[in-house]
Amino acid sequence: MATNKSGLNPENYASVVDGKKTALYVLTNKQGAEMCVCNYGGIIVSLMMPDRDGKLDNVVLGLSNIEDMKKRVDPYLGAAIGRYGNRIANGKFTINGVEYTLPQNDNTNCLHGGLSGFESKVWDAEQTDEQTLVLRYTSVDGEEGFPGNLDIVMTYKLTDENEVCIDYKATTDKPTLCNLTNHSFFNLNGISGKAEAPVITNNVLTLNCDKFIPVDAIAIPVGVKTPVEGTPFDFRQPALVADRIDDNDTQIKYGSGIDHSFCINQKNEGEMTLAAVCECPATGRVLSTYTTEPGLQVYSGNFLNGTVGVGGTVFQRRSGICFEAQHHPDCINQPKFEQCILNPGETYSQTTVYAFSVK
């Protein structure tokens, strides 16, 4: 029986995976917004946010039960991503002269931490109040080929200002890579009760980014940061997504749309900065993404292909858009990019805020 505004049945998310219990956690705020999270993968399953008329609707893509999650039916929908969000070329990297080899699960690349990344792990969960969920996971030395025991604390908070705040902290006992993010697919049209999720091509996007990261045919950076001026990646002024994602530009063709990392215009390293504003004129919903990270992977849902999700809604191609705050792809093998090596005695710290409003 549903006990939440999203219409989700908590029993559908209750299971035991690798000896750990999974459950659905419901966060609410004073404005009536609601976020449902499963501790399997730290997955944001649903997010009820108001439109300009105050009507609540689910604005993220999620799966309707734990079994689909375990079967890896679109495994990254709403999930926590690690140890390394995005791609590492050839599944190889070197730290302090030691080469490490990772699974190649995306062409010859290692994508999102390997064959079994954080999206498929059961996190220890503690709901500290109506608005806050604390998730903990220890990635053991050698997991998916990464060195060091990595202890992660990830905190989800739904504020009274309709912000989804995700705070990450991590420590290690060996030099390792740490590049965490969230892979929510947003749909500001709202998907509740719809047979098919509407496409997000009617959204208007603005990016606080003067440069982006061009890639090769298998999505590995070519090693430079390129000005967006004169390219379909120039969102410094508001632009309709539909006008850009089918451009004849080679980079657009490589990604079958937008699937690129953008360089956020940060004044100081690690400073919380507005990275993106996405607006849906049809509903009035506005999503503003703030982060302490240097990069924002924008993905226009080009490879969504008919997965049936929450409420029986079909997720068609381009029915969600991702704003994945992180370090740039393959940065460990790209000397011109900001690095994400974490050493013993240091604390990895990252905060991303998805702030919702209406206009």
Regions of interest found by a model, annotated:
Residues A2-K359:
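An exposed, glycine/acidic-rich loop-and-rim segment of catalytic or binding clefts
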